[in-house]
A protein has these predicted regions:
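Cleavable N-terminal signal peptides
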Residues: 10-11, 21
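Sec-dependent signal peptide cleavage junction
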Residues: 18-26
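Residue-level detector of conserved, well-ordered beta-strand and adjacent loop positions
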Residues: 30-31, 64, 85, 182, ...
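Acidic Gly/Asp/Thr-rich repetitive segments characteristic of extracellular carbohydrate-active
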Residues: 31-64
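Surface-exposed loop/turn motifs in large extracellular/passenger domains
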Residues: 56-57, 77-83, 98-182, 186-208, ...
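N-terminal extracellular ligand-recognition/capping segment immediately after the signal peptide
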Residues: 59-82, 86-97, 119
Length: 234
C-alpha cells in the first residue's frame, strides 16, 4: 500500500508542477523611452520587437502608458500566441501606419487604444496568421482602420515569399471600429483565392466585411459569422 501511495504522490506532484508551469504566463512591459529589462511596469523595455521576442513562445506584452511607432511595424516571428494589451499605441508614420503579423502564433489585441499621431488610416495585415481583436480595443474615432487577413496586395508580398492564393485566413473581432475587414487583401487585382477566409464578428462596429478582397479578386470559399456587433455591409 505504501508503495502505491508513494507512486500516487509522485504523480500528483508532477501534475501540480506541470499545471504551475502552464499557468505561469510570460508578461513583458514596454513603453516610450523604456530602458529596463521589461520584467515589470516600472522597468519597461523601449522596443516592441524586443518585447515580442521575449514572449515568442507565448505570452503577453503590456504597454505602459504610451508606445509610439514612427515606422510601419513588422512583428518578429513567434511560435506561441501573443497578446498585446494596455496603454496606448500611437501610429506616427502617416502614409504607412501599418502593423504586419509575424506568426505563426496568433496575435491578439485587447484593452488597448490605437491613435493617429500622423495620418488618418491604419492597416493591420495578418499575412494569413490568426488575428484577434478582443475586448476593450479602441480605434480612432476619426479616420479609417482596415483589417486584412492576408496582404495589402496579393502580388506585392512584404516577406521573402511567393504570393499565396491557397492559404486560409482567420480574423476575430470583439471590439473596436473598423472601416473594412477583408479576408484576403486590400489592393486591386483579379486573382482568385482558393483558400478559405474565416471572419467572426462578436462585437465592434464595421462598415463593410469583405470575404475576399476590398478591390477586385474572388474567393472560392469564405465563412463569415456575425454573432454580435454592428456590421453595416457584407
Amino acid at each position: 500500500m505504501k508503495k502505491y501511495i508513494g507512486i500516487f504522490a509522485a504523480m500528483l506532484l508532477c501534475a501540480l508542477l506541470a499545471l504551475s508551469a502552464f499557468a505561469a504566463e510570460t508578461v513583458v512591459y514596454v513603453n516610450d523611452g523604456g530602458t529596463g529589462d521589461g520584467s515589470s511596469a516600472s522597468a519597461p523595455l523601449g522596443n516592441m520587437t524586443e518585447a515580442i521576442s521575449k514572449v515568442a513562445n507565448g505570452g503577453k506584452v503590456v504597454i505602459v502608458d504610451t508606445y509610439t511607432c514612427a515606422e510601419e511595424y513588422r512583428e518578429p516571428t513567434h511560435k506561441g500566441d501573443i497578446i498585446v494589451t494596455g496603454g496606448k499605441y500611437v501610429f506616427t508614420n502617416g502614409a504607412y501606419n501599418r502593423w504586419f503579423l509575424g506568426g505563426p502564433g496568433a496575435t491578439t489585441f485587447e484593452n488597448i487604444t490605437f491613435e493617429y499621431g500622423a495620418g488618418s488610416t491604419s492597416l493591420f495585415l495578418a499575412q494569413y496568421f490568426p488575428l484577434n481583436f478582443g475586448e476593450g480595443v479602441v480605434t480612432p474615432s476619426e479616420g479609417k482602420a482596415y483589417v486584412v487577413g492576408g496582404y495589402q496586395y496579393a502580388d506585392s508580398v512584404p516577406l521573402n515569399d511567393e504570393p499565396r492564393y491557397d492559404a486560409d485566413s482567420h480574423i476575430t473581432i470583439k471590439s473596436g471600429t473598423y472601416w473594412a475587414v477583408s479576408g484576403f487583401s486590400r489592393g486591386g487585382s483579379m486573382e482568385e483565392y482558393t483558400g478559405t477566409s474565416h471572419i467572426t464578428v462578436n462585437g465592434g462596429t464595421i462598415s463593410t466585411v469583405y470575404g475576399a478582397a476590398i478591390n477586385g479578386s474572388y474567393a472560392l470559399n469564405c465563412e463569415i459569422i456575425i454573432n454580435d456587433g454592428n456590421v453595416q455591409n457584407v
